[in-house]
Design a protein with these regions (language model features):
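Cytosolic catalytic domains that perform sulfur/thiol-centered chemistry
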Residues: 3-212
Length: 212
């Protein structure tokens, strides 16, 4: 029996990686993305991603679970298309939106850390029948503005209280919470009488909360 050895974890310290990045002198992009999907083997998924991304000098903090992936990353700009190809190997990430940071910091991440977790975003739900792939309708900006003008619409801000306090849409429900899992029972209670007769519109920072 042949045993194959694969590098599935970091071998460099953050300090060593920072020196390598500076010496390379190449522009890096900071980006984030997420996707909900039914992952049969999260550990294998994690290992496959590490091998593919380590080869592209991709760094970042990534969580994978049986419900999908949530990633914040730094990659060399010249490897962007190759990186996208590693995503599109998976049907659920074909055409995925990569959110690029407004300002790019070459040292935003100094290790490639991919962790297998129970969930990609903690929600406090213990419901095996909950289907993360059964999502609502994504609205473009024009559609969002139009539905906000409908008096039959209820708007929910799924961000933390310190974000909604800075600014939020008019008449939005803004739970006084610090975590997503805290907001769910509060919002569910407030909306229980309107689930069938109102337009329920939700927004959050990156989409991962309100999509769930």
């Amino acid at each position: 029996k042949t045993v194959y050895s694969m590098q599935l974890y970091n071998t460099l310290s953050a300090e060593e990686r920072a020196i390598m990045i500076d010496d390379a002198g190449k522009q890096r992009l900071t980006l984030s993305f997420y996707a909900y999907a039914k992952i049969q083997d999260p550990q294998k998924f994690r290992n496959d991603l590490f091998l593919a991304w380590n080869a592209l000098d991709a760094l970042g903090r990534i969580y994978v679970a049986s419900e999908g992936i949530n990633a914040q990353m730094s990659i060399p700009a010249e490897n962007l298309e190759a990186f996208r190809t590693t995503l599109e190997v998976y049907d659920f990430m074909k055409g995925i939106r990569l959110n690029e940071a407004v300002e790019h910091d070459d040292h935003s991440f100094l290790k490639l850390t991919i962790k297998v977790r129970h969930k990609i975003v903690a929600d406090g739900l213990n419901d095996d029948t909950f289907d993360v792939t059964n999502i609502g309708v994504h609205l473009k900006a024009k559609e969002f503005n139009e539905i906000l003008d409908d008096p039959n619409t209820i708007v929910v801000d799924f961000r933390n209280h310190y974000e909604s306090e800075v600014g939020h849409f008019k008449n939005a429900i803004t739970p006084d919470v610090e975590t997503f899992r805290e907001s769910l029972p509060i919002i569910n209670d407030q909306l229980k009488d309107h689930k069938d007769d109102k337009n329920l519109v939700m927004y959050c920072t990156g989409g991962i909360r309100c999509e769930k």
